[in-house]
Amino acid sequence: DGMCFDSEGHIWVAMWGAGSVLKLDQTGTVRAKYCLPAVNVTNVCFAGEVLDRLIVSSARISADHHKPEEDYGAGQLIEIMGHKSSGIKQCQAQIPK
């Protein structure tokens, strides 16, 4: 579903319906796979002051009709720990008050 890049040029992809996030290199080779407690992962991004926190969002409602006890991470933000990567600044916006 959603995706982002890290500072080394890897692409991180949220895998809707697969309950995981993949880290791919420039050739498309999977370098890491992180399994999550949510089936429908929606997006992934780097956060924090130095963009070293990897945050994943998941959907609470889906057409798949998963039982809540089978998808206890649904509708939550999940932080992936131990990934040893950092993000790159994308776009910044100034929102007027």
Which positions does each model-derived feature cover?
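Surface loop/turn motifs at the tips and blade-to-blade linkers of beta-strand repeat domains
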Residues: 33-37
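Short, conserved, GDST-rich strand-edge loop motifs in beta-rich repeat architectures
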Residues: 58-74
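Loop/turn-rich, solvent-exposed surfaces of beta-rich toroidal or solenoidal domains
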Residues: 1-29
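Beta-rich, blade/repeat-based domains predominating
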Residues: 1-10, 38-53, 74
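Surface-exposed loop and turn segments in beta-propeller and other repeat-based domains
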Residues: 91-97
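Conserved beta-strand positions in repeat-built beta-propeller and related beta-rich domains
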Residues: 11-16, 53-62
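Structural signal for beta-propeller blades
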Residues: 19-21, 62-64, 77
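Beta-propeller blade signature
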Residues: 72-85
